[in-house]
């Protein structure tokens, strides 16, 4: 990780230690410098994010790749974060970092499209290599997720806010994250994921759950029991009853296939 990225994070972490969302008063000076409006990103999301009957949103990467106008709009949106003050621990900055992460990820896929997975061409993935200017420094996707969002906010909601362009990732929403509705939107995202088979599948042996709950177990309480307790917070009554009947995690699962809208078209019969 570049030293400049770590220095930015170290300063932010010292000033704003990890805790829950919006548990510190917003600082007006920082708020005024943050891109408050995410209308351009919302327009792009509404245009290119496609809902499906299986509950997973897909992205029309081919359509976006073909539109120079919208690719330019995406670039312009991302550039707005270059010199913004994003250090304060506020809902507005959580939304800003999450939106930026998702926008940069979508741009990365579009620039390399067609691909079958975000990991194509990489040993483990592009997250340390894909960088963007934000908050006055160059930061990678890896730094945004692990050194900024997880470190400063320290809440499980981070994992429902960012999208890795993959089938098993929590959905990319069809609108930008906004401070005013952040809590309810993150709650809805968590419920949608946990109540979908890619989040939790109940078997006769126990629970098959997303690898997210393995990779980031510490963020969900630090043990399998705490992970199960987290799942029960969001599980619908029928699923919750099944989880309680056999609350043992027996398998982790993850599908890195690209969340590509083109796959939906192939499943439609003429």
What are the roles of these predicted feature ranges?
Residues 7-16:
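Bacterial N-terminal signal peptides
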Residues 18-21:
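Sec/Tat signal peptide C-region and signal peptidase I cleavage site
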Residues 23-99, 103-270:
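Interaction/scaffold regions that mediate signaling and macromolecular assembly across diverse proteins
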